[in-house]
Curated annotation (Swiss-Prot):
Name recorded for this polypeptide: Flavin-containing monooxygenase 3
Claim: Lipoprotein is one of the keywords in the record: no
Predominant cellular place of this UniProt entry's protein: membrane
Gene Ontology terms for molecular function: albendazole monooxygenase activity; amino acid binding; flavin adenine dinucleotide binding; hypotaurine monooxygenase activity; monooxygenase activity; N,N-dimethylaniline monooxygenase activity; NADP binding; trimethylamine monooxygenase activity
Source taxonomy: Eukaryota, Metazoa, Chordata, Craniata, Vertebrata
Similarity field: Belongs to the FMO family.
Encoding gene per record: Fmo3
Modified residues (Phosphoserine): S401
Source organism: Rattus norvegicus
Entry GO terms, CC: endoplasmic reticulum membrane
Gene3D superfamilies linked to this entry: FAD/NAD(P)-binding domain (3.50.50.60)
Record flagged with keyword Repeat: no
Length: 531
């Protein structure tokens, strides 16, 4: 008899979970509170309680070759960085092509998940749902939670003295949809994340003045990287990860900061992070530096206090006549249908083994998919998480002991503090994390073996983009088209730009970084010979 799995949410994480369950012979039932798939990427012109929300102009920060489901490339003519409507089209196409829609119960709200009385022996869960004011409870062998992120806004009003006296508008970026309302107004955006920068840059075209207040600064990256290629196809490679993790810290930090400052000097723009060597996820915005140069956006430090019409910053400067304050201050995690102690088992912090499994459960029958954040794309990450989780639920993969899992969490927390600083998010190194998950299910590519067996593919895998197709080359869920997808990824990336053909397709030299590094010892050797 097939094991029944409840999947909560039909965004990209939920679809990955459904598909992984089917691949492992499990029986998924997905509960989605809205009327469509897509989750965060399904745009609505109004906000709804308990649902993720985006603004109309949102584009992806990851390119199409790096953020696809590993066996489902985007159409050739799709742009590298997509408008949310284009990504929603892809997500819907994936759900349809993989025949996943029949496993989803739409407009169904999960109100409660409880352990069954015999949980310690069976690992089963009682899931209560509500649809059309009618409640139902069903028993499942396992639960995969694929919601809860980007839903519950973090609005730290208590951190800003005098805000209660402020007479202008005040709201979270979750409620922002389009700029027209604020034409000719003076707007303060608090927060220097992706949403804050996007909203500030967009508003600066219609508002009288826009100020961004940032407590700690941030690196701001462009989607357009060296020689005009998508940033992640150049930066997220196994070779660069190898260098970062093996070079002396001083050299690694120097190289990282050099990359971050390649486009412009962050100090000159007031954007420089307080600790520039931390690998916190940077902000992606192609327009912000230009808006700062044009004077329509200014960067200020943290707000010290508010008055009825102004904000006083920590440097003593004042922004007068404010019409609106937008808090782009991120989101918290919340699972109102679940006992908090299951996910936040220690110090009220999210405590999950590999960012997925609650370690204290007697049976490993609950998994949280899509909570981990890294510099890589969400879709391939959730796909690999779901594949491993499905195998654990099926029983083909076994988790370590509780003590070992807690020790691993502590170790990862220490590394997180070193590389990413103090943050409430579960942040990790993308390629290291993906390889770790892939190794659990036998899907990690063996690079050395590839160099012997298929040198052309090995060169692309090691020096080229660490694209999602790499994790369907071998093992369970192997895709026969993975090799060709890897070898043709640059063609698909460049095709939508060839609307005016002026020459052949110019692919990047995969060895460029290697050759630059090789030049250093050569120059040193020449210097020693000459003297």
């Amino acid at each position: 008899m097939k094991r029944k799995v409840a999947v909560i949410g039909a965004g990209v994480s939920g679809l990955a979970a459904i598909r992984s369950c089917l691949e492992e012979g499990l029986e998924p039932t997905c509960f989605e509170r809205s009327d469509d798939v897509g989750g965060l990427w399904k745009f609505s012109d109004h906000t709804e309680e308990g649902r993720a929300s985006i603004y109309q102009s949102v584009f992806t920060n990851s390119s199409k070759e790096m953020m696809c489901f590993p066996d489902f490339p985007y159409p050739d003519d799709f742009p590298n960085f997509m408008h949310n409507s284009k990504l929603q089209e892809y997500i819907t196409s994936f759900a349809t092509e993989k025949n996943l829609l029949k496993y989803i119960q739409f407009e169904t709200l999960v109100t409660r998940i409880n352990k069954c009385p015999d949980f310690s022996t069976t690992g089963k869960w009682e899931v209560t749902t509500e649809k059309n004011s009618k409640k139902e409870t069903a028993v499942f062998d396992a639960v995969m939670i694929c919601s809860g992120h980007h839903v519950y806004p973090h609005l730290p009003k208590d951190s800003f003295p005098g805000l209660n006296r402020f007479k202008g508008k005040c709201f979270h970026s979750r409620d922002y949809k389009e700029p027209g309302t604020w034409k000719g107004k003076r707007v303060l955006v608090i927060g220097l994340g992706n949403s804050g920068c996007d909203i500030a840059a967009e508003l600066s075209h219609v508002a009288q003045q826009v100020i961004i207040s940032s407590r700690s600064g941030s690196w701001v990256m462009s989607r357009v990287w060296n020689d005009g290629y998508p940033w992640d196809m150049v930066v997220i490679t196994r070779f660069q990860t190898f260098l970062k993790n093996n070079l002396p810290t001083a050299i690694s930090d120097w190289w990282y900061m050099k990359q971050m400052n390649a486009r412009f000097k962050h100090e000159n723009y007031g954007l420089m992070p307080l600790n520039g060597t931390l690998r916190k996820e940077p902000v992606f915005n192609d327009e912000l530096p230009a808006r700062i140069l044009c004077g329509t956006v200014s960067i200020k430090p943290n707000v010290k206090e508010f008055t009825e019409t102004s904000a006083v910053f920590e440097d003593g400067t004042v922004f007068e006549g404010i019409d609106c304050v937008i808090f782009a201050t991120g989101y918290g995690y919340a699972y109102p249908f679940l006992d908090d102690s299951i996910i936040k088992s220690r110090n009220n912090e999210v405590t999950l083994y590999k960012g997925i499994f609650p370690p204290q459960l007697e049976k490993p029958t609950m998994a949280v998919i899509g909570l981990v954040q890294s510099l890589g794309a969400a879709i391939p990450t959730t796909d690999l998480q779901a594949r491993w989780a499905a195998q654990v639920i099926r029983g083909t993969c076994i988790l370590p002991s509780v003590n070992d899992m807690m020790d691993d969490i502590d170790e990862k927390m220490g590394k997180k503090l070193k590389w990413f600083g103090n943050s409430t998010t579960i942040q990790t190194d993308y390629i290291v994390y993906m390889d770790e998950l892939a190794s659990f299910i036998g899907a990690k590519p063996n690079i050395l073996w590839l160099f012997l067996k298929d040198p052309r593919l090995a060169i692309e895998v090691f020096f080229g983009p660490c694209s999602p197709y790499q994790f369907r080359l071998v093992g369970p869920g192997k895709w026969s088209g993975a090799r060709n997808a890897i070898l043709t990824q640059w063609d698909r990336s460049l095709k939508p730009m060839k609307t005016r053909v002026v020459g052949g397709i110019q692919k990047p030299c995969l060895y460029s970084h290697f050759l630059r590094l090789l030049a250093v010892p050569v120059l040193i050797a020449l210097f020693l010979v000459l003297i």
